[in-house]
């Protein structure tokens, strides 16, 4: 039994593409960045905490279970861009991303309670130059409101991406190849 410790519909959709049956549970954790924590360490810590929280929360569901936690952050010049609090916050983020290359880090952890496997995937994403009116129009679609970095590559925000180097599915929220490899190591995946 696999538990996806996430309420993200994007992660659930991606995980279903691997072909492994799973159940979703919410993993409520404190997502505050710790002082001196790099973006890479931060995203890996959150993925691990989510997996552990999912494993603990699913104790009544199945004895033999794995829990998968994942987290994705958008980073530019070593600064993590989270989900925007309001339009001004989203505008600032999108202005910073405008015409620039940034990184998207996605970490995935799978735990069986006593065993833990983790991966970190880095993807470079380059944006076109954005005008103020493009940013305002994009905000009005509602899409940026709950997205790290204020954009969704799989949605309307994809039209701003001029180049991607790495895993598209990792930018969406779950790197398929790497997740399948983790599941294989934990004996639950379909082989390539």
UniProtKB/Swiss-Prot annotation:
Q: Does the keyword GTP-binding apply?
A: no
Q: What is this protein called?
A: dTTP/UTP pyrophosphatase
Residue numbers marked as site, Important for substrate specificity: 10, 72, 154
Q: What class of enzyme is it?
A: hydrolase
Q: What does the record give as cofactor?
A: a divalent metal cation
**Major place of residence:** cytoplasm
Location comes to: Cytoplasm
By sequence similarity, the record places it as follows: Belongs to the Maf family. YhdE subfamily.
Write out the entry's keywords from A to Z.
Cytoplasm, Hydrolase, Nucleotide metabolism
One GO biological process term: nucleotide metabolic process
Q: Pfam families per the record?
A: Maf
């Amino acid at each position: 039994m696999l538990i996806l410790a996430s309420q993200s519909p994007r992660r659930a959709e991606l995980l279903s593409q691997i072909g492994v049956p799973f159940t979703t549970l919410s993993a409520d954790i404190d997502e505050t960045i710790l002082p001196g924590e790099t973006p890479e360490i931060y995203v890996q810590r959150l993925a691990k905490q989510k997996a552990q929280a999912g494993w603990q929360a699913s104790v009544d569901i199945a004895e033999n279970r794995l829990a998968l936690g994942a987290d994705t952050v958008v980073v530019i010049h070593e600064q993590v861009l989270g989900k925007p609090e309001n339009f001004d916050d989203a505008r600032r983020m999108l202005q910073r991303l405008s015409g620039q290359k940034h990184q998207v880090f996605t970490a995935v952890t799978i735990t069986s309670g006593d065993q833990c496997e983790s991966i970190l995937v880095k993807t470079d994403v380059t944006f076109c130059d954005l005008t103020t009116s493009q940013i305002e129009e994009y905000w009005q679609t509602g899409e940026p409101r709950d997205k790290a970095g204020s954009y969704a590559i799989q949605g309307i925000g994809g039209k701003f991406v001029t180049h991607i180097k790495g895993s598209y599915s990792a930018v969406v929220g779950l790197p398929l190849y790497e997740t399948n490899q983790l599941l294989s190591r934990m004996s639950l995946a379909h082989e390539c």
